[in-house]
Amino acid sequence: KEFKDSELQLYIDPETGSINFSDGVLFDYDQYIIKDTGRDYLRKFIPQYIKVLLNDKNKNYISEIIIEGHTDTIGSYMYNLDLSQKRAFEVAKFILNDDFQEISNTEKESLRAILTANGRSYSHAIIDEDGSVNEGKSRRVEFKFRLKDEEMIYKMKEILDDEYDK
């Protein structure tokens, strides 16, 4: 529910709960500095995301929140690995910066304990039905979470589904 009625351009994977920002929302092509519009999207998205994952009901189940950068297949693997890592790092830096007032310092402290930022280059490119790489959809930043206990995966999926369906 938190994101279903939102004007944010994102995709929620129904199987994993990972949230992907559409191509071009956060970054210009081949850049890692967050665009002004991307900053606005993060200011809207992060408080909602944190409210769901780190509320009293859920926070004890979350072992890690992952910001994962992905690129298209244009250019070398190493170039894209560097770019995807820089993008993920820039998002983490923006969220945890003192200037980011949309979440409390207490929430930032909780995040610092479990937040990671990783780059994947083009190792998880998005493939269309015809077998070709969708370069635009491959350029993305994903927000993922890991649970402390494998059996809790199903519990959290139910919780997120309930939140999404409200």
Feature locations, PLM:
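Periplasmic OmpA-like peptidoglycan-binding domain that tethers envelope proteins to the cell wall
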Residues: 32-39, 66-155, 159
